[in-house]
Amino acid sequence: MSYRELVVELAREHAEALSDALLDLGALSVSVEDADADTPDEQPLFGEPGLVPDRTAWQHSRVVALLSADHEPAVLLAAATNEIGLAETPQFVVREVEEQDWVRLTQSQFEPIPIGERIWVVPSWHDAPDPDALVLELDPGLAFGTGSHPTTRLCMEWLEQSVKPGQSVLDYGCGSGILAILAKKCGANPVIGIDIDPQAVESARQNSERNRAEVTYGLPDACPDGEFDIVVANILSNPLKLMASMLASKVKPGGRIALSGVLARQADEVAAVYARYVDISVWREHEGWVCLAGTRRESH
């Protein structure tokens, strides 16, 4: 089957409504992009759980709709603009999408990733480049965490240097389970992974089975009582601040905590919240993101 892409550039206030209308009228998928990306006018947009974003699209937005060959792009766009009440149909471009082996194309975009001194994150369709390395087999999926993002890399590097055999580890916000699996491969025991998303929990379980790593996963209400030698949380700054008391309470006195998902400009604010519980500072920065690490005081 052949496909077409309908590309429309328009003002921010109409982007979301047009996207919804195109989907209602039969578009297979719709994405909204910054029409000024890779130019001096590019606008970064960030959002975090617990915060209401100040805007949901770019001032100059590009709507890209994927259509099957039996849809006429001009007719579909005219109907969509009429549905949302635009006075006239915006200018558009139609691009033909060549039929490809999408599985092979997707796989070609993911190569083994070296991390730290001896870690490789390897998709299942690749062989490990170094047979003596500490290998995590992980395919890209729905849950966050494949080692490619700076925050995941920072946490993995910290765990590689910090985990001692037999230590207990809690990975809070485990996503794909990559950090919990690494902790287990570094000798930690027991290892617990917690995530608010049931789909992430299931994905993490499958990844642990594939890597023959015994990790216990669950939702937040299944988080065991007690304290851990190491707590790691790669989430985002706002949830980290909201959960500071709870996360710090999970660290044994003298135990260690690592936090990421934090932009460099947010580091001082997050550290200030945790400072009442732990001695904490920026451990390392990479591509504008930081990993904060610290030790829980003997009493607080």
Curated annotation (Swiss-Prot):
GO terms for molecular function: protein-lysine N-methyltransferase activity. It is found in: Cytoplasm. InterPro entries: Ribosomal_L11_MeTrfase_PrmA, Ribosomal_PrmA_MeTrfase, SAM-dependent_MTases_sf. Its EC number is 2.1.1.-. The keyword Hydrolase does not apply. One of its GO terms (biological process) is methylation. It is an enzyme of class 2 (transferase). Pfam families: PrmA (PF06325). GO terms for cellular component: cytosol. Keywords: Cytoplasm, Methyltransferase, S-adenosyl-L-methionine, Transferase. The keyword Zinc-finger does not apply. S-adenosyl-L-methionine binds at residues 152, 173, 195, 234. It catalyses: L-lysyl-[protein] + 3 S-adenosyl-L-methionine = N(6),N(6),N(6)-trimethyl-L-lysyl-[protein] + 3 S-adenosyl-L-homocysteine + 3 H(+). HAMAP family: Methyltr_PrmA. Belongs to the methyltransferase superfamily. PrmA family. Methylates ribosomal protein L11. PANTHER family: ELECTRON TRANSFER FLAVOPROTEIN BETA SUBUNIT LYSINE METHYLTRANSFERASE (PTHR43648:SF1). This is Ribosomal protein L11 methyltransferase. The gene is prmA.
